[in-house]
Amino acid sequence: MPKYFATCARGLEPVLAEELRALQAHDVVPGRGGVAFVGDMQLLYRANLYLRTAIRVLQPILEAEVRSPEELYQVVHDFDWDRFLTPDHTIAVDSNVRDSGITHSKYAALRVKDGICDFFRERHGRRPSVNVEKPMVGLNLHIHADRMVLSLDSSGDSLHKRGYRPIQTRAPINEALAAGLVLMTGWRGETPLLDPLCGSGTFCIEGAWIALNRPPGLTRKWFGFMGWMNHNMTQWTRLRNQARADMAKTLPYPIAGSDIRCDAVNFANENARSAGIGHLMKFERYDVTDFYVPAGPPGVLICNPPYGERLGEDEDLRPLYRTLGEVFARSPGWRCFVFTGNSSLGKQIGMKPVRREFLFNGTIDCQLLEFHP
């Protein structure tokens, strides 16, 4: 069976591995920035449809030692591309190069393209065209320490692009990271979920999709595998229809968010409607100082407060973190989580975290802090 590699934000590898095991993937091995696994084409479809924390699902097809652009070209040119492409395909190459004798990512991608096109020109008299916007077959080149891996990109656009968030507030976290953080809390829909600093509403929307068993890729119109020679449209349609039939229609417990900013609340409600769940939840305007958990069974409270990326902002944000500590203190029985990129601000909460997970939000070193008031 083919080998695959699903990429994710650093720190989410254990969560992604758990997702893959739930999909019955074989030989699941977490790595740096992703998880390797083995499976058939059906599993590849399910991975793209169901994975909440993955960014891309890649199928490595060529690995070699290359120390120069010329060596890279030759390795690619000598590969049997008739197994995966025809001259009628359009292609694009995305590349990432580090710690290598090949120093320029764009030039490396160009040499891969040249190798593929020359292969077809010499064998068939025609070559694939390049379409960087929407290629029929996307390729991903990764070179580290002179070791190259060239993969087919089965996802196309990044899987974090769910399609429900055209409207964003300042500095949102992406959907895949938000879903991963919710999953990292252990929450699966069996208790209430609240966000007192909801921003775009991403935690709550991703949480609702988890509780409803709603696959994040359900309404996506194009995946990279749809341009592959071995794509089975009948099998894919059957799988997606079954996923739609398996969804719940109502939330077992409340999911809600609030924010002091009117624009954020309006954006969050619009995003929830775009996600098809606007009728199941409502975002309201509250100052966090006035936030109280509702009566009833305790659940999970999760938020992503600002963490002062610019010089001098720490002092302005300390009262907000102290207020979060007060909110947590009056929420006995609830498990409270803060995702922050500033450990000194996290200390302003005034409680000792019972758990600390280390992750990255882009290039920012962050922590998910868990508190039990």
Task: Name each region found by the language model.
Residues 1-137:
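Non-catalytic nucleic-acid substrate-recognition regions in nucleic-acid-modifying enzymes
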Residues 8, 259, 340:
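Short beta-strand/turn micro-motifs composed of small residues
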Residues 87-90, 190, 251-252, 298:
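Phosphate-coordination loops involved in phosphoryl transfer and adenosine-cofactor binding
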Residues 98-101, 158, 306-310:
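A short, flexible beta-alpha/helix-coil linker loop
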Residues 150-184:
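SAM-dependent Rossmann-like transferase core, predominantly class I methyltransferases
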Residues 173-292, 309-310, 314-316:
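Conserved S-adenosyl-L-methionine
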Residues 287-373:
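C-terminal catalytic and target-recognition region of SAM-dependent MTase-like enzymes
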